[in-house]
């Protein structure tokens, strides 16, 4: 009951010592828990059963979480800073072996700055996938020097271009597996989102294991996607991650874009120069996960980093055009040729010609 009350008020678990549980004779059998190397135990409110086991449990939980989440999101910046500090302090109560996952983006910058106020010497990790923007690498390394960070940079052992050739290209997140399968079959293009796992998660997990890291701070926010909101409803602001074999916390779960901007301006934090160049996201420049949308980062890449755009076009150009064409057909809307011309024509007429050829072929087949 105490776990339930705490979860639906704060989205946090209960942190206690194993010895205290033994002293009061409390059994935690059946409860999800995590034990660190310092004798501390974290008790989690159980996640809901799968839909097939109980069709009502998950929607009911989601409804309760969204209601409380709305209250937290209405708080002013000071209130949200207090929530973030509460999440961070709960993690630090559980373990002092903590790292901040820093991508060079605005969200992780705020998460890093908040953590530094509590733990100045916290470990800071950047996973350099080898397809990070050069501006991001320069920015993060300079910040590490200026802020005297306990900074570490790791790289994957796999090559992005070779991996995508073998596994497939990434064009949708993990929550879109059904859509990806349909699109892959329709376009005859191999799709996969395994690059995130192989190029980001694996080297991070190895680093955490080698350095004995037990807790990770992220800049994840629930307002960024429905999948994140549903995941948050299941596990809250501090959870155990099987992927990293660590605790993972979301101190910024209730923050909006406006909150992030306000905090950065309040503390005069230096931001990644990519934002002033028109980018909304500063992750891997070769990632195609937003290529199916008209606000695709590919447009900005084409304008600001034409040499990087050309590398993407040469490697994935024909697959991209087939995917766009097939997506239009799956969603039953006519793809705007002007959109294609704006994105591809300056670099290659052959891509637009390929699209038109496929379009003529489909018309003949339909006739």
Regions found by a protein language model. Give the residues of each.
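Extracellular/secretory pathway and lumenal proteins
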Residues: 199, 288-291, 351
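ATP-dependent adenylation/nucleotidyltransferase module used to activate substrates
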Residues: 1-266, 362-367
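Short, charged/polar "capping" segments at the starts of alpha-helices
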Residues: 133-135, 226, 296, 328-331
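Short microdomains enriched in Cys/His and/or Lys/Arg
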Residues: 303-319
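Disulfide-bonded cysteines in secreted/extracellular proteins and peptides
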Residues: 195-196, 284-287, 347
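Mid-to-C-terminal catalytic subdomains of enzymes
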Residues: 253-308
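Short flanking/linker segments adjacent to small metal-binding domains or redox-active Cys/His motifs
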Residues: 322-367
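A general structural signal for short secondary-structure boundary/capping elements
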Residues: 147, 173, 295-298, 333-334
């Amino acid at each position: 009951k105490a776990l339930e009350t705490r979860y639906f008020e704060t989205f946090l678990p209960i942190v206690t010592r194993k010895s205290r549980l033994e002293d009061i004779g409390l059994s935690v059998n059946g409860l999800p828990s995590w034990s660190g190397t310092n004798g501390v135990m974290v008790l989690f409110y159980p996640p809901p059963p799968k839909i097939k086991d109980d069709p009502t449990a998950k929607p009911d939980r989601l409804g309760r979480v969204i209601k409380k989440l709305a209250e937290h999101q209405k708080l002013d910046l000071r209130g949200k800073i207090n929530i973030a500090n509460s999440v961070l302090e709960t993690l630090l109560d559980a373990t002092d072996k903590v790292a901040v996952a820093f991508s060079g983006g605005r969200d992780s910058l705020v998460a890093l700055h908040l953590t530094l106020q509590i733990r100045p010497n916290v470990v800071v990790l950047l996973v350099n996938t080898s397809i990070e923007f050069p501006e991001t690498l320069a920015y993060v390394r300079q910040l590490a020097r200026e802020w005297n960070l306990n900074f570490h940079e790791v790289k994957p052992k796999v090559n992005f271009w070779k991996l995508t050739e073998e596994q497939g290209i990434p064009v949708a997140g993990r929550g879109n597996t059904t859509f990806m399968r349909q699109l892959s079959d329709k376009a005859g293009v191999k799709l996969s989102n395994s690059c995130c796992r192989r190029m980001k998660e694996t080297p991070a997990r190895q680093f955490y294991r080698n350095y004995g890291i037990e807790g990770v701070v992220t800049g994840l926010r629930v307002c960024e996607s429905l999948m994140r909101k549903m995941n948050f409803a299941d596990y809250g602001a501090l959870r155990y991650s099987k992927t990293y074999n660590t605790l993972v916390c979301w101190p910024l779960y209730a923050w909006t874009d406006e909150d992030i901007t306000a905090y950065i301006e309040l503390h005069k934090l230096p931001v990644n120069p990519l934002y002033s160049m028109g980018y909304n996201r500063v992750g891997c420049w070769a990632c195609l996960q937003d290529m199916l949308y008209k606000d695709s980062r590919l447009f900005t890449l084409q304008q600001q980093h034409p040499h990087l755009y050309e590398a993407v076009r040469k490697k994935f150009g024909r697959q991209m055009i087939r995917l766009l064409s097939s997506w239009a057909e799956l969603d039953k809307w006519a793809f705007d040729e002007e959109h294609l011309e704006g994105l591809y024509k300056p670099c290659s007429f052959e891509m637009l010609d390929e699209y038109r050829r496929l379009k003529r072929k489909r018309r003949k087949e339909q006739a």
